[in-house]
Amino acid sequence: MLFFTLLIQLFLVPVLCQYACSSELKFGTACSENKTSTKWYYDSKLLFCYPYKYLGCGEGSNSFESNENCLESCKPADQFSCGGNTGPDGVCFAHGDQGCKKGTVCVMGGMVGFCCDKKIQDEWNKENSPKCLKGQVVQFKQWFGMTPLIGRSCSHNFCPEKSTCVQGKWTAYCCQ
């Protein structure tokens, strides 16, 4: 019995998690049993978890109650990429690494980094540290503190009521 349990935990659970994480986002359907809520899904293009408005019934397998649940289930702790999940132009071993060619910047992971296009990386960093022209960026609480509520697309209706969604090149954010 112990062998069977171990076999399931080592092989079946990771396969099912990967299936869920790579599944298409399903918003569900409106129904009288449940009300709408904000849930999270793993975006396999940008390799990150983003919020969306769940309509109440019929959610897909790529749907999580919280950002933390999504990240724990789908994103390996050592996974990183260049901004917008664009391809790297080499590897590096420290910020400011001179091994990266001109026009690229070292983006560090755990032990090694990628040489990423500087222009794209700057755009990515700006988009993930949003500023509102009017009002404040909507934030949400994570285990380490407050952080901007950033979604993949305004069409996912993740912004709270009475806030405005601002769409960027890769992601979107909410102003209030």
Swiss-Prot record:
Tagged with keyword Signal: yes
Stored Pfam families: Kunitz_BPTI (PF00014)
Domain of life: Eukaryota
Sugar attachment sites: N34
PROSITE patterns assigned to the protein according to its UniProt record, in alphabetical order: BPTI_KUNITZ_2
Name the UniProt record assigns to this protein: BPTI/Kunitz inhibitor domain-containing protein C02F12.5
Residues in BPTI/Kunitz inhibitor domain copies: 21-74
Signal peptide: 1-17
Organism of origin: Caenorhabditis elegans
Keywords of this entry: Disulfide bond, Glycoprotein, Protease inhibitor, Serine protease inhibitor, Signal
SMART domains: KU (SM00131)
Any one GO molecular function term: serine-type endopeptidase inhibitor activity
InterPro entries registered for this protein in UniProt: BPTI/Kunitz_domain, Kunitz_BPTI, Kunitz_BPTI_sf
Disulfide pattern: C21-C74, C31-C57, C49-C70
